[in-house]
Regions:
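Short, intrinsically disordered terminal tails adjacent to the first/last structured region
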Residues: 1-23
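Cytosolic juxtamembrane amphipathic/interface segments immediately preceding
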Residues: 23-27, 31
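A structural signal for multi-pass alpha-helical bundles of membrane permease subunits
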Residues: 31-314
């Protein structure tokens, strides 16, 4: 007679209870307090001088506020509608875009050429670096007064040089066809040193093994420059172009000090127009509306550049 064996079911262990979160130690809490304490000055500065002015400006653009205090109530999008129909605003914006185009190209190309020449091993490199970069350290007022004297129709250096080769004098700052180019020449001389240093640093970071290998393959200087240097300088060039475009779009100092936007508004930038609308025309609300239109344009350009950069690197 066989006896049946019964096997007791195996006991399953109960799931472990979730451990309670460890209490924050006094030292950790103290570190958090110290972190917030050290961050507080920056946060206060950020809120007071960046966030609040943006909010205040956006609210102001929806009002008829003026320096005289009249018509300061909410008027909705009337300022924006007026700005989009303002021919002078569009002309000033066109001047700004034109200045950005004709100044960015030489500030990139000439800076690259100067950096390449210095990187070739010219003697007294410290002197070349100092010569090209030192104008960038000057104040805009100094540069503007210096070039205003050089552009003087009767006593200026440029017309004196033209007279020596038999060319009639040029009204550099009084001719609508020439005035913007005169401002661009001054701007290039003044700010090219910054781009020059960026390019020079990037060139000196390219490994010399690339050039040595190219020399062994029989590549000359020009071939090495276009096949090795330029591709390696791609990220630096993109950065310089972005910085230069954003800086040129905000041009104000040298134009206001050299031409005051003239002759006949031929050199008036959008920033100057915003300034005049607010502090000459006393229309702060209208000035704020134009500022936000301009801000939207800069934001679109910046986003387009970021998108193009990511698409290129992908």
């Amino acid at each position: 007679m066989s006896t049946a064996r019964t096997t007791a079911p195996a006991k399953t262990s109960a799931p472990a209870a979730k451990s309670a979160p460890a209490a924050t130690s006094p030292r950790s809490r103290r570190d958090n307090i110290h972190g917030w304490a050290f961050s507080a000055p920056f946060l206060v500065f950020f809120l007071l001088f960046l966030v609040w002015p943006m909010i205040s400006g956006a609210i102001m653009s929806l009002t008829g506020k003026s320096l005289t205090g009249a018509n300061s109530g909410i008027i909705g999008l009337a300022n924006y509608a007026e700005a989009f129909a303002d021919a002078d605003m569009w002309r000033s914006l066109g001047n700004t875009l034109y200045f950005t185009l004709i100044s960015t190209v030489p500030l990139v190309v000439i800076a690259l050429a100067l950096a390449a020449l210095v990187n070739m091993g010219l003697p007294a490199q410290w002197l070349w670096r100092l010569s090209f970069f030192s104008p960038f350290l000057l104040a805009s007022t100094v540069v503007s007064l210096f070039f205003a004297w050089m552009y003087n129709p009767e006593l200026g250096l440029f017309n004196d040089l033209l007279a020596k080769v038999g060319i009639p004098p040029v009204a550099w700052l009084n001719d609508p066809a020439v005035a913007m180019w005169a401002v661009v020449i001054a701007t290039v001389w003044w700010t090219i040193g910054f781009n020059f240093l960026l390019y020079l640093a990037a060139l000196q970071n390219i490994p010399q093994q690339h050039y040595e290998a190219a020399s062994l393959d029989g590549a000359g200087g020009w071939r090495q420059f276009f096949s090795i240097s330029l591709p390696q300088l791609g990220p630096t060039t993109v950065m310089i172009v972005i910085l230069q475009i954003l800086a040129s779009l905000k041009v104000f100092d040298q134009i206001y000090q050299m031409t005051e936007g003239g002759p006949g508004g031929a050199t008036r930038s959008i920033v100057q127009y915003i300034f005049e609308a607010g502090f000459t025309g006393y229309r702060l609300g209208y000035s704020a509306a134009i500022s936000y239109i301009f801000f939207g344009l800069i934001l679109l350009i910046a986003l387009a550049q970021v998108f193009a950069t990511r698409k290129r690197s992908a």
